[in-house]
């Protein structure tokens, strides 16, 4: 399999490099109205992959153009974009002067945390057009599926409800996520729960995915990847949009979006409301979601004030336990959540085994352009979250809840059936800011943020079969976590010559995290930790020729453990997790021509004290982690696009990697079955694969324009085998899978509408039977290894039909 893939990719790579390297050329200079050069301005041949950026003197050169007319787009942040029809016959010169925008735009909001065109890092930009076409209600991880080294997972099996992601094997708790430059990660778990932001994609303009350490950002430490989301800007004209979808597994999605357009060239308002429902593929993982997005804007010539409100509410059937290995082959939709045996010996399921949560985001953004070179951006943010999950517990011991035994007549009960709720209530607020300077050869940014978090965790028993004197809604535990985080960064791109620029990025980050109170097992988890991190980054960007670029960078990142990491080690100083450090080396090459593009990236990520998953989960579905002294991820990422004609095209990505722990020491208990005595043992397994890190991933989008309004996509995804613990035992391994989706888009031109679209999406068209995630572990009896494992099976063939109307 590897040899076949390598051969096909080599052929494709060779073919891309030989396409369109000869032909006509177009060159010139891009300046402002005073004739000052605009270094780094974008010059793009519309409708093709081809584009370049101006050098330090503002000069550009497009080579390999076909003879004839081309539409060229010239753009630079803070200036009005120009598009020109240019007839290329022979070598043509075209100089362009760009006019400063009279009004500040939304782009300044996210410029400080994003990789620019000359930043020496590996990243992918996902446009709003792509997000809109792929958005059938699935979580954001499924809309980013085609980016390199990306693996998405779903508890319900159909991408709705609880979803998550990994990039280069890096789990979601290490991936920094911002929305309009504002941190989105939960400070304690350091994850983003996309289920709490249903249909967010309908309000997103574009997303940048940075692989590796990336640029300095706000909020949680980026320890392997970053996701930077920009919400939709304000439309100039009034508009309204309606989108409705229905499909397999009882899935329905409806959304309405409307906006006033610019009023008096100063004010604008827009809103979106979405309702999303699904039964899920796995039994009793159905979900109901409601979300709303409100945005109001006021702007003058040099200032912009924007207020965003994002509201999300979800009710989801619990599916985080997965399917036991012994049942997987018999019933892929089995869900053990809420299972119990009644007094007649009949297996039943508690009908309200659900997760219920509300999360609201409030953001106030201010940006001001001081002059043509200097701008200020700042934002205040507040996130409120509150909710619980409810579950039935059979034969729950009174002592585990700090309760006395109950006597009824002459019978004394030490256990009873209960229904309990575990609550979370949290507040997260802060300030982020950046000062941006861009003139001639220098593009510099100074920024940072201060963020505060307080989260309550508590549990209540709402029903007991034999309550005794215990009152309803009895609270059996309470703890609070507080986190304070402050950061300061400075970053700069400087053009040393027409072909070479240098990049530097320095960040200081301070974190204090404290826990107090008892956990659900009644143990005191009180503790406090402080960390100071210095995260330097440096790199070089080379402009080899028109259409060819290369980069090299070295970055350092540090990350503190999560709440679960600390909680699981409470009371054992030797088990207290250590912070992690990552050294990330990236080298890349980019080639673009009119009909093809290729990106080749080599990376080496070397860790000290990396926290890796043991394969086990906590009782709320978090991975239990352990520090390993030395580990690494090295790999090659290939991205390519090929458009031989206006009729057909292909985009694909492929990653080949090696993800290893050096000298992994397995610790386990060996039980003697004669008397069930325990013997603690260890085994040095040498160099092993890191859990959840497939060595091969790949994706592709083969598309054809059948007729002007009709477009067909065959979207494919391959994920190689991956272990779900660190022992490389085939009993605890996810098999490789290859999944194909068919998408048919029909977009007729209707004079009465601004736009209309009808889409049919057929998922998993070959009905592949696969699991995208699992967890488990082992134990020993009389020296013989045993395995326990739970899997998350994904749905077979399904469909979604979607209608969209724009007014």
Predicted regions and their residues:
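C-terminal beta-signal and adjacent terminal beta-strands/loops
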Residues: 650, 720-723, 746-807
